[in-house]
Structure formats: C-alpha cells, structure tokens
Amino acid sequence: PDPKKSQQWNRGAYLVEGLGHCGACHTPKNFAGADDSGSALHGGNLQSWFAPDLGPDLRVGLGHWSADDIAEYLKTGRNRFSNATGPMSEVVQYSTSKLTDDDLHAIAAYLKDLPTKGQGGGDNTKPSVDANVASAGKAIFGDQCAECHGADGSGEPTFFPPLKGNNNVQQSDPTTVVRVILEGARSVPTKARPTPLSMPAFGWKLTDAQVAA
C-alpha cells in the first residue's frame, strides 16, 4: 500500500495490479515475453488483439473517460465511448461485472491517476493519410458502416460505439480494429445490460485493400 494515497486508490491498485492482473494484456511485452514495466498499462498486443492504453492520453488512452465512464464500462460492458469485445468481453462477463460499485470506482480512481506515457499503443500525432486512400475509405465507410455508426462516425453511445475519436481506432497498432472488421464482434450480456449487441463480419466481402482504406 502507498500511505500517501487514499484507501480507495490503494484498493484500486490491488485490484488492477494484483487480483485483476490487467497488465497481462494491457502492458507491452519485451523480447522475452516479460512485461515492459516502464510502459505498464499503456497498451499491449496479445493473442492477436491489441489491449489499449489505460493511461490519460487523450488520443489513445482514457483521457476523455471519467471515473464513472470507466466504472460503467467494467460493470456493463458498454459506455458512451466503447463496447467491450474480444478477450475484454470475457473479463467483463465473468469478472468485473460481478464487482461492487465501490470496487469499480476504486479501479477507476487508480487508472485515472496513471502517469502519461508518450508511446504506448499510439501517440498524439495524427497520421498522414494518402488522399486517394482516404477517399476510398470514406466511400466504403458510407456503404458499410454509416448505417449503424453514423455518417460522421458519432455512433449511438451504449449501442453502436462512436468511431470518431475512438481510442481503439486511433492506436498505432490496428490489430483490434482490423480483426473486428474481418470477424465482427458481439457484446456480452451482463445483469445491467442483458441484451447483447452484435456487429457483422466483413471479411467475406471486403478485400484487404478495402479494409486498410
């Protein structure tokens, strides 16, 4: 325990660093497969999924998420920014959705106090994009994605996650985004959100170049 921190923070640290072992996915690994402690909880690729940065970065981290947003996501699998998918959906279904509200807010308090890391799963620099590729991507998005996620990518929070400003979309590692496009996604039922939502797979109809665009 850190005597300089609150009881809530210390409880959150225990749940995140110990019992919850969040770093197993969200901390990058070195060449030997061990955690890169200098980048703890700032994004990692594991089992062909990219677990995003949990730090305060506004582009790729949780900088825009409030403590209540974090608690809601862990309890229900959804919030106004994102829906849990992949391995994280199992974490929510079998673990965090069972926690007390006090424990969920303790986790949130700890995560909101994480230090900034310049390069975790992404950076603050908006990447340059070829104009022709961007134009093609816009057309494909309009045909295949806009009906649910909106023409401007704003989505319908807690149902169809917004893609504009989405920290998963803005990671420098696109693994999760590409995988969801190819394979689709399905949210998990929780007590608070008992009806799961699903996104269809597009791997059968889009080429690699179209997915990249």
Each model region followed by its residue ranges:
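Flexible internal linker/loop segments at domain or repeat junctions
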Residues: G121-A134, G155-P157, S187-A192, P196
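An acidic site on a long C-lobe helix of protein kinase domains
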Residues: Q8, G18-H21, S66, T100-D103, ...
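Sec-exported extracytoplasmic/periplasmic mature domains
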Residues: E17-H21, T27, K75-N79, S97, ...
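An amphipathic alpha-helix signature
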Residues: A67-A71, K75, H105-A108, P174, ...
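Active-site substrate-binding loop specific to GH73 endo-beta-N-acetylglucosaminidase modules
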Residues: T27-F81
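Sequence/structural segment immediately N-terminal to covalent heme-attachment motifs in c-type
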Residues: K4-N30, D35-G43, V129-T158, G165-E183
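Axial heme c-ligation environment in periplasmic c-type cytochrome domains
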Residues: W49-L62, T76-D102, T158-L163, R186-A213
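Post-cleavage N-terminal segment of exported redox proteins
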Residues: P1-S6, Q47-P52, D68-S135
